Each structure stands twice: as structure tokens, then as C-alpha cells.
Amino acid sequence: DDNFFISRVKPKQRFRNQNTQVLKDLNETNDKRLVAWVPFNNPETNALPDGIFDSEVFSLWSYVSHWGNWTAPLGRVPAALMDVAHKNGVAVSSAGTVPYGSLSDEWRSEFRLLNTLDAQKLADYLYYYGQDGLGYNSEWSEFNNITRDLRNKHIAVNKLMESRNPIFENMWYGLTTDRGRLSFGNMLDNNFEQTFGNKDNKAFSLFLNYNWNSDLVLRTSVDYAKTMERDPLYLYAGVNMQGGEPRTNSWPYLKNYPVSIGLWGAHSKNMFWESRNEKGSSEETMQRSYMLRTERYFTGGTRNPANTPEVTSAMKYNVDNKDWHGMSTWMTAKSTLSWNLAEEPFISYFNLGNGKFFNWKGERKNNNSWYNIGVQDYLPTWRWWFSTNLLGRNVPETGLDAEFTWDDAYVGGSCVRVFGTHTNEYLHLFKTQYALQTGDVITFRYKHLSGSGDVKLVLTAKGSETSPINENAYTLLTRDQAIDDEHWVEKTFTVGSELAGKDLALIALHFENANNINMYLGECSIVRGTARTPETPTITSSNLLAFNKSGVDGKLI
């Protein structure tokens, strides 16, 4: 059904504020991009919603620029994946997974049909469905014409999409050259000049083959991109996660060059997801293992981008990957939380998009397993940035920790758990750029399970990011407060003169005198006025598909 493949969320725009970055020396010239050119979830269902709790809920979107859905056939991507990615400013594309070698008759026919299609129609199709590009596993060989025509078609589509979708990006694997022949040069040179394209004729971003690990290759590629007046950050150093390639001397080379990172692996499942049973095979154990794998891979072995380990040439992605430097070594955590609050409120229930039950505003509605990545909330920007100084990198050896839990939720099937002991520590939650007005309502909701501590909500403004605004006015929890592990505590604050007219730059929590504290975070929101009640939807058709003791499956359009 088309409705499951039409994204209803337009890509949100990311913003840059170096004052709320972990690494202040990263800017638009060296802040690496990342393409995850990998499958999503299981190949049978991809990102389509279903009733399976143990499904993939990727959540580190702030470190991803583009998700190339490897098991989504060319031109067909589940809307749920596009919706959550677009909320976070991430592009999503499908993949033409052409086999290695001479171009088959089937793919010749496919490409000829594509090449005869009017560029405007192709652009309209992609825009209608919400797709942000097309990707090609270009490791074929043919006699130029098909490859040339395919390239020219994408140049035309790029020009049409430039004003309609600013994150639109086509991907090309760097084996098939401009002339349709195979090359293992692993770099941008005259073999890929037209495929990459100059500033006026952009065709594809180039995913370099896996042997890019030399100064000569990287320097040549960067210099060549600059002569074409293209940003070299649209060159992706390919990483074969399945094969562990490049096998030696890899990551340290990237420190010196503005080349981005491209992840591949494997054909049917991504490597984070495929072997998530390394710590056990229960559904929740596998979900926790997957979460730890991705958190360590993207934010370092500490799961805190403020104190990542030293850069190595390792290619690991397992649960105990504690010595891994993490993608946050190379790139900032991106945020889209900057829109006009009069048009849309900011609301996060810390919901991952799956669960063993479904809660609505603290009430259990059912105990059925469910999955819909498309309803995932905005999640903490940097992921567990703890520090003893605000926006700092002073991380204690032992202190507070945080994780997602599927044991409770205010809305959905998950929430955030913060726990541990420390006298003074900050947890940075959201990088924002909201223009606040008098009367805006800030709500924070939590559940205090055990332990004690003083917890305050920290808000800072653009231009004075390290200075909390009247922190004592935003108390959430005091150390002598009674424990209540059954009820969600709501704290609301109305924006007054201290915040009105300022751009909110940071939302954080300040923990003082924490002693074995254990609390759940269930909501963080900023709402202006009252939301307009949407029009009642018109049901054009309904169909009962199946029913059993667990519930009913139906279809409404």
C-alpha cells in the first residue's frame, strides 16, 4: 500500500552552534558527514511497522547525514524510516544493488527504462514519496552508454531537487568509472570526475572503495574535489564493517583530511543488528546489546562524547567495544530543534519506537508488543554527555550513568533511566535554538524510584551558553523528597522575562548530592499556546484482516 511508503514529514533543517559542541574545533570545513549505507532491521519487513518488539530502533541520528537503506529496492522506502530520519535532518535513499561484473540483461533493461524517464517526472516521484536520493552499488562493467546516461539523468534530477529538498543526495560506489569500466583506484581522480561532478553539474556523492587508507589517496581526492569546486566532505571513505576493511592503518589517516565516513555491511542485515545476540537471546537482552553496540560505535567506548578513547585502526562494533574512539571523534552531534514553536511544539517522551506494552500519559493501554520507528521521539542530542562542568569535558571516573529502559514509559514503550552517585554532575539533554516568548510552557516529567539527590533543570541562552538562567527557579527534585515509584511527577515552568526574547541553546539536568539515585525521565516539552485540533479524518475504507486473543489487525484508509 502506498500509504506505508509516503513520508509525511518534510526534512527539518539542522543548525550549527559551536558553543554547544563537545569539540569546539569542528566547523563546516572539517565536520565529517556519515552515510550508513546498510540494511535496516530484517529484510522481510525492513522498517514497516509491526507487532515485533525486537525490531531495530536506531537512535543515534545526530551523527548520521544519510541512511542508504540497502535492502529497500530502488525507489521504494518505508515511510516510517523516512519520517524519523527527516525529523532529525537525515536523508534516506534506496539502493540499486547491482551484482559485481558485467551488467546483467535485467539491470540493463532497468537502467534503460530509468534513463528514458523524464527527469521532471523522476524528481516529482521522489518528492511525492519523500525520498532523498537514489544509491547505486556501482560495481558493474559496460561500454559507457548506460552509465553516461544514468549520470546525466541524475545531474538533471539534482538540479530540479536543489530548491525542493536541500538534503537530496545520490550515492555512487567508487568502482564503476565515468566510462562504465571498473577501477580500483580508491580515490577521486579523472576516472570519477564526471560521476562526482563539478559545482554546476553534481551527479553523485562518491563512496570510496575500501583501500583509501593512505595520505596519497586522501590528499589527491581532497585536492581534486577542490579543483572541481565541490566540498570534499561529500567524499565518503568506505568502511566494510562485515569484512573489517581497511584492514590496517585506517582511522588515524582521517584526522588530517576533510573526508567523510561511509559505512557498509552487510547484504541483508547491518552489523549492529545481525549479531546482537552476543550477550543472550532474550528479546530485551538483544535490544540492550544493540543499543550498547550503536552507542559505543557512535559516541565512543565510554558512551560519552566528552571523553572518547584514543583513535585506533580497530574495526569492532561489539557490546564491549570500550576502547573504541567513536564517530563523535570526527563529527558534531547535529540537531534540528530550532523551528517556530508557534507552528509546532517541541515534545519528547523519550520513546524509541518499540515496546512490550503501550502507555499513554502514564496509563497502560495494552500489554502487546509493538514496533513503529516512525513515531520515535526526539532523543538526547549527544547521548549521555555527563560532565562536572556545564558544556565541559571534565568526566569523573565514577559517576552518574544513563540508559534507555523498556520497563516503563509515560508515552509509548520506553523512557530514559538516570542512576548513580556523584556530588555534582550535569547531563546535557538537548541542543536547541528556540526563540522563546512570554507564556511558553516548559514541562519536565520524571519518576523517582530510589535514592536521593537535588536535581534542577538547566536552561541557557544563545550567546551565554555556559551560564544557567536562574537555575534555582527550575528545581525538579530535592534530596529530602519522598520516593514515589508509581507516579510520574510533572513540573511546569512558564517563560517570563528572564527567558522571553532569548534563543534557548541548551536543555540539561544538574545533579547535586546524588546518592544511588534512580529516576526515569518521561517528558521534556516546550509548548506555545494551545495546539490546533486537527480536522477529523475521513475514513474511505475499512477492512478487518485478522483477530485472535492478542488483538485485532485492521486496515483503515
Give the ranges of each region predicted by the language model:
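Substrate-binding cleft of secreted/luminal carbohydrate-active enzymes
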Residues: D1-R8, L235-P396
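Pro/Thr/Ser/Gly-rich low-complexity, intrinsically disordered linker/stalk tracts
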Residues: T530-I557
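Extra-cytoplasmic beta-strand recognition segments
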Residues: T381, V416, Y426-V455, K491-F493, ...
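Chitinase-like catalytic core of GlcNAc-active glycosidases
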Residues: L26-G51, S55-V217
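Extracellular carbohydrate recognition
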Residues: L499-K502, F511-V527
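Substrate-binding surface in catalytic domains of secreted glycosidases
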Residues: N137-T312
